[in-house]
Amino acid sequence: MLPEDLESTPFPIIDTHAHYDDAAFDGCRDELLRQIYGYGVKKIINASVDLDSSAENCLALSRKYPFCLTAIGVHPETVEAGGTLDEQRLLSLCREPSVVAVGEIGLDYHYSDDKKAEQRDIFKRQCEIANELSLPVVIHDRDAHGDTLDIVSETRPKGVIHCFSGSTESALEYCRLGMYIGIGGVITFKNARKTVEVAAAVPMENILLETDAPYLSPVPYRGSLCNSAFIIKAAERIAEIKCIPVETVLKVAALNAARLFGNALKLN
């Protein structure tokens, strides 16, 4: 299932954001996870999008595959008009041993304006709960850059802005707040000027590598099912931008992941 032309990785890979619970993997999940582990992907964080089936499926994956860790949270797209956060359910799920973060949480104003208040309230409360549990957050920000930064500035969690799409100035502001910037396959796209500028400006010590699998496959694999081995393509592009070896990108990103998410992300 891995492309024959995919070059080998010079250093073990940590994918800090994926969705192997997604139905897109239903016909190939087990074989693919075995393949990518053999390729060199040694840690994966699966991010849930709700506190129900997605959370349970992510946790089940971690029980079957110990190299899979879990982030538990309510994604903004699953927030309902008039909805509230089931705090006790979130707290209960976060006690599971594979849970290393609260996520995927955040704001998404791309499709609708009718749930902005609910999204903000639930996002803010999840940041507060993450702080109470001493867990980092994994943040989704789509077309909501100002409000996302405001809530992070107010609640001051530690964490990562997943698939960062904001300006260089806001990326550097997040770095000043102690946050990490998540970069994946988008950086290989021909229209990725903003992401390239962010990668050039942000210190390597503030960058995490991710895929968002099964989404956002990098060039030259666009249109195919994304998987964690494809991180090598994002790492190569960052190495080119920063004029450093690919191995350095992978190594520093792995150290960053362990620093943020804890010992469970340390490479043996």
Please describe what each predicted stretch is:
Residues 1-268:
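Mid-domain alpha/beta scaffold segments of enzyme catalytic cores
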